[in-house]
Amino acid sequence: MARTMAAAWPPLLLTLLELSWPPPGTGDIIVQAPTQVPGFLGDSVTLPCYLQVPGMEETHVSQLTWSRHGESGSMAVFHQTQGPNYSEPKRLEFVAARLGTELRDASLRMFGLRVEDEGNYTCLFVTFPQGSRSVDIWLRVLAKPQNTAEVQKVQLTGKPVPVARCVSTGGRPPAHITWHSDLGGMPNTSQAPGFLSGTVTVTSLWILVPSSQVDGKSVTCKVEHESFEKPQLLTVNLTVYYPPEVSISGYDNNWYLSQNEATLTCDARSNPEPTGYNWSTTMGPLPPFAVAQGAQLLIRPVDKPINTTFICNVTNALGARQAELTVQVKEGPPSEPSGMSSNIIIFLILGIVILLTLLGIGVYFYRSRCSREFLWCHHLSPSSEEHASASANGYISYSDVSREASSSQDPQTEGTR
């Protein structure tokens, strides 16, 4: 049946088919190319395609062909004798193929990359005697987005409002935006067509309830895209406008007539900054001993006790707020407790105990020494004691002595007799 079909085919077609069939026993050739190539919108991109011939294999390449899936005809052809032919000569170019050279490199360069260029392309080598070999390459068209982040200045509203805005403009595919914040809140993200066809602009808002504690704090917008080596981080410092928050410091509840000048300070937080400070009392203007100096109030020494409530009123562009503080100036500091302090008494007691202990030890050693000396003297001079006893009483008395003492004195006694 195969011979019947072959007989029915035209001779020229049979010749072409024979050229495309590899002879038995020949080594296989390989077309090498990446499965996907990225390119940026408006730039040029190269679709690499190479013919790998094994060992000593003899291969003759007669033609290189590029085509796109879904389209009829070829977009670029390079013939071994006729040279290149392009469907769009100003946008296409063979990178290495030249007349008179071995056609092993079919890489194709595309200029002015457009969104519609994205697709699947086929690189084809027509060889002899191995036949045709091809490979498919996916061209991915990217657009690198431009990213910005800005603060949304707000006032105290009591309800959630956008406080920061992050925009990724003209990305293909759309960028992915996330937020990082320790202040709470939630994102609101939307997409819209970009300025260039096929691109997308992503806008993300960070929403929370504004407060004075949020003012000056920061949130971070994180933008991720295929064209970035790493995510882009954009930090936004928040701005919340609010009227002054006021307090008075400097009074320690321990002021007396004898002390030096004292100072009260009006502490105010606001955005925008305070524009004025006004000091007064609940009774009206300041007394003579109080002198206002901007955010400070100087209290001069007084000669009589006072009990006054001072008021500090602070204003800014959004309004005014005030704080009150009652100050008492007393006759004098509390008197020190009579007598010695407990610490001094404790040290004195410890000193006395140590002294008595040392005296006791000294007396003990002194008496012990005297006892030893008395016994020694008594043993050496018994006659003196006897003489003293006879002189005092008018008669002679003999005292007992130890054998050792008697024996030591015998020679002397005998000699005397």
From Swiss-Prot:
The lineage of its organism: Eukaryota, Metazoa, Chordata, Craniata, Vertebrata. It comes from Chlorocebus aethiops. Residues 21-343 are extracellular. The gene is PVR. The chain crosses the membrane at residues 344-367. Keywords: Cell adhesion, Cell membrane, Disulfide bond, Glycoprotein, Host-virus interaction, Immunoglobulin domain, Membrane, Phosphoprotein, Receptor, Repeat, Secreted, Signal, Transmembrane, Transmembrane helix. This is Poliovirus receptor homolog. Residues 1-20 form the signal peptide. Mediates NK cell adhesion and triggers NK cell effector functions. Binds two different NK cell receptors: CD96 and CD226. These interactions accumulates at the cell-cell contact site, leading to the formation of a mature immunological synapse between NK cell and target cell. This may trigger adhesion and secretion of lytic granules and IFN-gamma and activate cytotoxicity of activated NK cells. May also promote NK cell-target cell modular exchange, and PVR transfer to the NK cell. GO terms for cellular component: apical junction complex; extracellular region; focal adhesion; plasma membrane.
